[in-house]
Amino acid sequence: MSQLVYFSSSSENTQRFIERLGLPAVRIPLNERKQIQVDEPYILIVPSYGGGGTAGAVPRQVIRFLNDEHNRALLRGVIASGNRNFGEAYGRAGDVIARKCGVPWLYRFELMGTQSDIENVRKGVTEFWQRQPQNA
């Protein structure tokens, strides 16, 4: 199975979700000057920012990570977290990234997710990778 790449703000909600998920994952650093580069296909897990609008929904660190053509080429899907208080903008970062990068928006969860979210994502990620061609 390929990996997960995620970003978590200082609130650590996404970090806690990843820890509970128990799957291999690499974190995009909070420090914008530090960068990572991935070497295999991955699913991105990202929080949504901005209080509900499209502008600012995707964290700057994630934009910078995806602006690296190598990283963007290996993206296979996106999972977004958000806050239901934002209404239609709940999980908007997932929609923005999926549309701009041409990958499926696989799932969204609120804040640090529920146990049901953990189970759904774990199962969904496993099934997603099983459906992918070996060299995709």
Swiss-Prot record:
InterPro entries: Flavoprotein-like_sf, RNR_Ib_NrdI_bac, RNR_NrdI. Coiled coil: none annotated. Signal peptide: none annotated. It comes from the Bacteria. GO terms for molecular function: FMN binding. GO terms for biological process: protein modification process. Belongs to the NrdI family. Probably involved in ribonucleotide reductase function. NCBIfam families: nrdI. This is Protein NrdI. It comes from Shigella dysenteriae serotype 1 (strain Sd197). The gene is nrdI.
